[in-house]
């Protein structure tokens, strides 16, 4: 059996694996990446971020067409099937795979296809590839295997009407009614997508409120707009059984309620991809969710074995995963770019979308920080009035004494783009992080960025 030696071996070709591999290669290291799928990109490209956001964009265009009175002269509203809309996502996936495959080739990173399993702390067996079994020796190893939907054993996911957040992309028809169990980020995003296609959606939330990690006002705005669009949200409900038949799926909840729909989508939790990695051979034990523990340098308890991305849990975002992988690699090559990823912007691609960075009002109140609030409502902005995307707001939280920007929370069209303007100021050192920047800066007009000036003036007017 052939054995190949590398400075760095990365398991997984998703965002975290790509970040780790590219950074190590650019520092002159000999790098290998092991990927068990036929194409690079990981769950992000094939099952998660890219397809779901491409779906969302297509649905948003349909909604804009159907709600714009100008287009009524053309005819009646247009409706598209889920498979038809999915075709747009498939085109984007192909483009992403092509680009990312070129990254590996251009940086001379060796790609091995197959399933990875540790033999010992430095050697990894690759099985199922074109060359049968191969062994890679890595001086340093990065585990970046990602995650998959958590699937409870008492739900039959082999039933043709019961889906999880990965298999939903294989849906071959548009259901009239849909039950979504789990009201986290993925559940809320798919609720927006399906209700935009005219599907009647029941969103079952085991918790007390939607996306409780968000600022309360933003969470409330999401709840209102989902309901306003026709989503029925049920809080504090846990499933008792999920039973599918030839005509639909019946969800029975522990409260005694029973709901029937054409299809059922499970969106409640994810599990790290650590099974079958042979971790027992090196003394690593994942937690109950299959996630690995790391220190502030992304090291596991084995000094030369690192982990990054969804496989270590929070925040389980593609953007953070790439930076985590790059930072783990920075620790390996000892460059000057290492940072432990903490203050990550959140992008939630509901319709309208949500984005935030920094602290919430509840966190600042609990910490007894003297803060003030500045608000800008999209309905008052000329650019939003022009585009018709008037739903939403920008909310700035700042220290009322030092004027330091503490939190940015945005709900509405382009929220995930808008938030980065404020993030750039929040990341400035010392007195350069100030809300007064937005008052003393000239913004293009009309733009959505102007919301920062409006919100800053609104907040400063509250200071006395």
UniProtKB/Swiss-Prot annotation:
Into which EC class is this enzyme placed?
A: oxidoreductase
Supply one GO molecular-function term.
dihydrolipoyl dehydrogenase (NADH) activity
Taxonomic superkingdom: Bacteria
Q: List the disulfide bonds.
A: none
- Coiled coil feature spans: none
> What reaction does this catalyse?
NAD(+) + NADPH = NADH + NADP(+)
Q: Where is it mainly found?
A: cytoplasm
Query: Where is this protein found?
Result: Cytoplasm
> Which residues hold FAD?
35-44
Query: What keywords does the record list, in alphabetical order?
Result: Cytoplasm, FAD, Flavoprotein, NAD, NADP, Oxidoreductase
Cofactor annotation comment: Binds 1 FAD per subunit.
EC nos:
1.6.1.1
Q: Among the entry's GO cellular component annotations, what is one?
A: cytosol
GO annotation, biological process: 2-oxoglutarate metabolic process; NADP metabolic process
Q: Which cofactor does it need?
A: FAD
Q: Which Pfam families match?
A: Pyr_redox_2 (PF07992), Pyr_redox_dim (PF02852)
Q: Which NCBIfam families match?
A: PRK05249.1 (NF003585)
Q: What is the similarity comment for this entry?
A: Belongs to the class-I pyridine nucleotide-disulfide oxidoreductase family.
Under HAMAP family, the record lists:
SthA
Main function = Conversion of NADPH, generated by peripheral catabolic pathways, to NADH, which can enter the respiratory chain for energy generation.
Q: What is this protein called?
A: Soluble pyridine nucleotide transhydrogenase
Organism in which the protein naturally occurs: Hahella chejuensis (strain KCTC 2396)
């Amino acid at each position: 059996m052939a054995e190949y030696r590398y400075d760095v071996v990365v398991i997984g070709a998703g965002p975290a694996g790509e970040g780790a591999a590219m950074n190590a290669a650019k520092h002159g290291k000999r790098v290998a990446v092991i990927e068990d799928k036929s194409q690079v990109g990981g769950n992000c490209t094939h099952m998660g971020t890219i397809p779901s956001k491409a779906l969302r964009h297509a649905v948003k265009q349909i909604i804009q067409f159907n709600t714009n009175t100008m287009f009524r002269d053309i005819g009646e509203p247009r409706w598209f099937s889920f498979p038809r809309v999915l075709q747009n996502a498939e085109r984007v996936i192909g483009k992403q795979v092509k680009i990312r495959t070129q990254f590996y080739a251009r940086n001379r990173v060796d790609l091995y296809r197959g399933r990875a399993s540790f033999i010992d702390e430095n050697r990894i067996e690759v099985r199922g590839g074109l060359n049968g079994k191969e062994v890679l020796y890595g001086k340093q190893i990065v585990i970046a295997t990602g995650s998959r939907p958590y699937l409870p054993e008492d739900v039959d996911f082999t039933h043709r009407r019961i889906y999880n957040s990965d298999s939903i992309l294989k849906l071959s028809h548009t259901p009239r009614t849909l039950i979504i169990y789990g009201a986290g980020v993925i559940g809320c995003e798919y609720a927006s997508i399906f209700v935009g296609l005219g599907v009647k959606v029941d969103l079952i939330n085991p918790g007390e409120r939607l996306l409780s990690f968000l600022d309360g006002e933003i969470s409330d705005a999401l709840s209102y707009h989902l309901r306003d669009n026709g989503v029925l949200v049920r809080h504090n409900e846990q499933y008792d059984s999920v039973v599918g038949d030839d005509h639909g799926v019946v969800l029975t909840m522990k409260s005694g309620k029973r709901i029937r729909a054409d299809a059922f989508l499970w969106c409640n939790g994810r599990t790290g991809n650590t099974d079958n990695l042979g971790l027992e051979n090196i003394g690593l034990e994942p937690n109950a969710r299959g996630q690995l523990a790391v220190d502030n340098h992304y090291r596991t308890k084995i000094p030369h074995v690192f982990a990054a991305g969804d496989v270590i849990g929070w925040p389980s975002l593609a953007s953070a995963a790439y930076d985590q992988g790059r930072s783990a690699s920075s620790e390996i090559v000892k460059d000057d770019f290492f940072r432990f990823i903490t203050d990550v912007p959140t992008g939630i691609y509901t319709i309208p979308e949500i984005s935030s960075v920094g602290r919430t009002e509840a966190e600042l109140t609990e910490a007894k920080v003297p803060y003030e609030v500045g608000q800008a409502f999209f309905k008052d902005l000329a650019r939003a009035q022009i585009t018709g995307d008037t739903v939403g707001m920008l909310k700035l939280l700042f220290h009322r004494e030092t004027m330091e920007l503490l939190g940015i929370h945005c709900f509405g069209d382009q929220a995930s783009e808008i938030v980065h303007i404020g993030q750039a100021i929040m990341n400035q050192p010392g007195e350069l992080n100030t809300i007064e920047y937005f008052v003393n800066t000239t913004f293009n007009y009309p733009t959505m960025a102007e919301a920062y000036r409006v919100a800053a003036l609104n907040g400063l007017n509250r200071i006395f």
